[in-house]
Design a protein with these regions (language model features):
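TPR/TPR-like (Sel1-like) alpha-helical repeat modules
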Residues: 246, 287-288, 318, 322, ...
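Positively charged n-region of N-terminal signal peptides that target proteins for export
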Residues: 1-5
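Extended, well-structured beta-strand/loop surface patches
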Residues: 49-114, 120-220
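Early extracytoplasmic/domain-onset interaction patches
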Residues: 21-51, 57-58
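Alpha-helical adaptor scaffolds
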Residues: 219-325, 329, 333
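Boundary at the C-terminal end of the N-terminal hydrophobic targeting segment
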Residues: 16-20
Length: 368
């Protein structure tokens, strides 16, 4: 009798394996369709590949209430086939569920190297369950061996809306983190993934890209420098990138492109480095360029104003009016000044005619 049962298990497993490894276009075993979901966290790509069984299986009908603890076993069990005598659930159906990470991440606060791992779930009846990251070369749980485990992290089941097909996804997305989850029937299991050095990873990829085709465009050098300035990282190299955008050779040209925009980026890098005086020198040059239009100067003045430097912003607004007295952004500039004039000296200055922005233009600044 034992021999007969073992033979059935072997034949069933062999048939399933043959179906899943065949290159023929045939339905998957057990109607568990292959599925894959990917999510980017900054420059890091995370992909989960799995087979998705359903609650209402065509062969066994409604399995609601019989998934967790029955179809999905608690703890570790002997699969009755393969090399292992004690294995967790494969967190899906048929082949092993796998998770692929393009870069190093943290999972539940623990380090996990880039690569592809088999993803198992140790379902516990009481207390936390555990996600297990292990080698991915096995099939299902049949070749599971704990000596190849790379990481185990706890997870608690949560009640969730009914989900017919076992589904992986991502939510709670942030620029440097996301939560992966498994949902099936009325349960959800989560997995927090963090990329703590996301800005540094961006810089590394940008640096690599600038050695290729993007390095032929001054705009990409400028974008790279601006990213570093905005995030206050890699500033010494960012200053080199900003200079290349201004004066570097591109596509046979002898110099880059010196205009208001590229000079403003260089000034932003210098400002992030704490070199405000040097940044001001660069912007003085930018203001004198023929292409320095009223909108560009106005936007820059607003940026300075938002940084809390009211006096400096006021001087830039005045400069804009001197350079472009007939520009339609005049009223916007006047109103912006008025809303931000708070001290007695500022009110005194605002009540005068600032190149067409005062009472003579119908804009009584202190009262707007």
């Amino acid at each position: 009798m034992k021999i007969a049962v073992l033979l059935v298990i072997v034949l069933t497993s062999a048939l399933a394996f043959a179906q899943e490894t065949s290159e023929l276009a045939i339905p998957p075993n057990g109607d568990a369709e292959r599925a894959e979901v990917s999510q980017w966290i900054g420059p890091v790509k995370i992909s989960i590949a799995y087979h998705s069984p359903r609650v209402h299986n065509p062969a066994t009908n409604d399995r609601t209430g019989h998934i967790w603890g029955e179809l999905v076993h608690y703890g570790f069990v002997d699969e009755g086939f393969g090399l292992t005598q004690s294995a967790p659930w494969r967190a899906g159906a048929n082949e092993s569920t796998t998770i692929t990470l393009s870069d190093d991440v943290k999972v539940d606060g623990k380090d996990l190297k880039a690569g592809t791992y088999a993803l198992f779930l140790d379902l516990e009846k009481t207390g936390p369950s555990f996600w297990i990251f292990s080698r991915h070369q096995g099939w299902g749980s049949f070749q599971y061996d704990p000596k190849y485990d790379v990481l185990r992290v706890p997870t608690n089941s949560q009640d969730a809306p009914f989900t017919e097909f076992l589904t992986y996804g991502f939510d709670e997305r942030r620029p440097d983190s996301a939560t992966a989850f498994l949902r099936w029937e009325k349960k959800r299991f989560s997995l927090k993934i963090d990329v703590p050095n996301v800005s540094e990873l961006y810089v590394a990829k940008i640096r690599q890209q600038l050695e290729s085709w993007p390095g032929f465009r001054y705009e990409d050098w400028q974008t790279a420098a601006q990213f570093c300035a905005d995030n206050k990282i890699n500033l010494d190299e960012a200053l080199i990138w900003a200079d290349k955008a201004i004066s570097g050779p591109f596509r046979g040209a002898s110099v880059g492109h010196e205009d208001f925009s590229t000079l403003q980026t260089k000034a932003a890098v210098l400002d992030a480095m704490g070199r405000e005086a040097d940044a001001d020198v660069v912007m003085q040059k930018a203001f004198t360029l023929p292409d320095a239009n009223a909108v560009q100067i106005y936007i820059y003045a607003m940026h300075v104003l938002r940084s809390g430097k009211k006096d400096k912003a006021m001087r830039i607004f005045v400069l804009k009016q001197q350079k472009h007295p007939d520009d339609l952004t005049r009223i916007c500039g006047c109103r912006t000044l008025a809303r931000n004039l708070t001290t007695t000296s500022e009110l005194a200055l605002g009540s005068t005619d600032i190149d067409g922005c005062g009472p003579e233009s119908g804009e009584s600044l202190p009262y707007l």
